């Protein structure tokens, strides 16, 4: 099985636990976040779906070669925190939105009033008087607190997004990654230790006419 060599067990192995992003995927997600109108609940509801499209898995392992023809970058701890802040801010909902009513006001359904009664100065039966909320009302205080939270959530969202958009990624690709990490990809193709380079064992056979002993040949006897 093909795999990286022993040098992988140092720095390259440690980085497999870090979040990685593919550069084009990163640009797409941040562009879509920039189009979000945070003041609109419908747009805030889109944020979790946008963030779910951000892929942060490590693109390589000891048995999986770094991708070719793609640029990847490691995300810093600060970038991960900024993404988490955007996710958290997206969960904000105004209390008035949750109640589907304006805090402190009474929903009124007036009864049918005859044309003659409408000219009377008295308050018609069935028509409730709408009073503005008082500062001492608990509902008013809840709504004030809710809007303060909205300001905090909006600020957190825009600051985190500005940080991510200004982030200087350090993209890398296969050749650069393997050079920087000093790793090589392949199987165990090297010859065993002690084996000759030519792949043969023993000494070379003697040439023709040679005894192989290194001594001069014995002359023929005299007749």
Swiss-Prot record:
Q: In its UniProt entry, what is this protein called?
A: Coat protein
Q: Where is the composition biased (Low complexity)?
A: 202-216
Region entry Disordered, spans: 117-136, 181-223
Quote the subcellular location field of this record: Virion
Record keywords? Capsid protein, Virion
Provide a GO CC annotation, any one. viral capsid
State one molecular function term (GO): structural molecule activity
What organism is listed for this UniProt entry? Tobacco rattle virus (strain CAM)
């Amino acid at each position: 099985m093909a795999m990286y060599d022993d040098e992988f067990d140092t720095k390259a192995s440690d980085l497999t636990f870090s979040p990685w992003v593919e550069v084009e995927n990163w640009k797409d997600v941040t562009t879509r976040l920039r189009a979000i109108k945070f003041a609109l609940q419908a747009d805030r509801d889109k944020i979790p779906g946008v963030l779910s499209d951000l892929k942060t898995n490590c693109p390589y392992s000891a048995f999986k070669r770094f991708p070719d023809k793609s640029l990847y970058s490691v995300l810093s701890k600060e970038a991960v925190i900024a993404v988490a802040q955007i996710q958290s801010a997206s969960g904000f909902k105004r209390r008035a939105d949750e109640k589907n009513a304006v805090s402190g006001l009474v929903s009124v359904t007036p009864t049918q009033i005859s044309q003659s009664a409408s000219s009377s100065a008295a308050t018609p039966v069935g028509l409730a008087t709408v009073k503005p909320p008082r500062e001492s009302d608990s509902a008013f205080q809840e709504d004030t607190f809710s809007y303060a939270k909205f300001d905090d959530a909006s600020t957190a969202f825009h600051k985190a997004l500005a940080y991510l958009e200004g982030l200087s990624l350090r993209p890398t690709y296969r050749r650069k990654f393997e050079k920087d990490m000093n790793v090589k990809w392949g199987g165990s193709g090297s010859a065993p230790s002690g084996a000759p380079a030519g792949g043969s064992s023993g000494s070379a056979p003697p040439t023709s006419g040679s005894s192989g002993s290194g001594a001069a040949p014995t002359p023929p006897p005299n007749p």
